[in-house]
Structures are given as structure tokens and as C-alpha cells.
Amino acid sequence: MRGDEGARSHLSGGREASMQVREGMSEMVLTVGPGHTLRAVAGLMSERAVGAAVVMDPEGHGPGIITERDILIAIGAGQDPDAESVAEHLTRDVVYASPDWSLEEAAAAMVRGGFRHLIVLDHGETVGILSVRDVVRCWTEDGAICPLPSRAAVG
């Protein structure tokens, strides 16, 4: 599904600006497997200062996502982060964004779905991840294109 490339929003005192997901997403994606423990993934997320990891399924079911919220819910429910695997807690029914979507479309998808991260796919390949933080960073008062976080890293 492609976004409307002509979508506009009124930002910065009425000045029109339009940005695409590709301009705000991080191309440095933390990738983990479904067999990782929750503790291992939490450690990787902490080291890289990210709130989500793309879960690549070796059986080819498409990328899923595990977030800090998923880990907190599991631990809060009394589950052992050293014994619980990502496969038991990841989101498989993922809404994917296109790099051509406007940030407005991505933000609307996040609001509708109640989540804070979108995996960005281009022709079926993961090309990035977009977080609420990325969207907010892009919607600055001056409308500047945002630099990527310096601590983002590939896992």
C-alpha cells in the first residue's frame, strides 16, 4: 500500500511541509531472532538506545516486531525474562509502512493501531524503522529534515 505522495500538512506557522517516511526513518535496524530471550533483547535495545527490534523469522513468515512495551508487559506479568523467548511475545500482525508514505500517514497508522513503531518495507524488504520519536523529531518548528540518532546501530 502506497501513501499519497502529495499529502501536505500545515506546520510552522502555516508554512506547508511534506515529508516522507524515508526522510525520518532510521535505516539502522536492530534485528533479532525469535529464539532470543527477552533479557537478551532488552540488553541489545538498551545498548543501542532503541525501543524496538525487528524479528526475522527463519521460516520466512515475514518480519515481526518486539518492543520495550512487550518486554515490560511480560515481566510485569511475572514471566522470567531469562526463560521467555521473543517468539512468545512478538507482534506478528504488523502494519508496515512504505518509505513513500507521508509522515502524516505513518502517524495516523500508529494512532489507529495503538503502537509507536512501524517497520518500513520496500518491495518486501525491511529498509528501516520509524518511531513516534522520529516523527516528532521531524516535525520541528523549523521543519528541518532530522538527522538520525547517533547511537542507532545494526544488530
Positions of predicted regions on the chain:
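A glycine-centered beta-loop-beta connector
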Residues: 24, 45-48, 53-69, 110, ...
